[in-house]
Amino acid sequence: PPRSVEDPAKRLFSGPLDGAGRRSLYLQMSIMDPPRFLVGFNLPDLKLPSGKRDATNVPAQALALLNDPFVHAMAGQWAVRLVQDKGSAPADRLRGMFRSALGRDPDDGELQSWTAAAHSFATQNDLLSDEAAWGAVAHTLFNTKEFIYFR
């Protein structure tokens, strides 16, 4: 809701009022409308107490990371931020992406293959924008084994 004066102390959650761009470890859950994205990641039934979690369904999780609109939106937002920095070379963008997503720099082989993939995404189709190409790269990085699993 619009407010004439923004007072963070009067709000339940900090961040923008529309909820965009906020990182969170805690989510407000509604019993009647649980987050659909987290259901694939073994979200417990909010209507029942659960002492033990069920086994996870890894194929459903992989499909959620590939197809969920939330994941596509996050990849698109990351691409917009990357493209706004017009002076950076593709290799520099990829190094920054690896640092942000995986906490490390890519090795030479990874940098070469990811640069080739970014170039392939960008040249696949004349209508494909720079943002769409980098969104595809970000989406692919979200689906790497190293991004999904903790060591």
Q: Where are the predicted features?
A:
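Short glycine/proline/serine/threonine-rich loop/turn segments at secondary-structure transition edges
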Residues: D126-D130
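Amphipathic alpha-helical segments that form the core helices of the histone-fold
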Residues: Q112-T123
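Structural motif corresponding to the C-terminal cap of alpha-helices
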Residues: A122-N125, K145
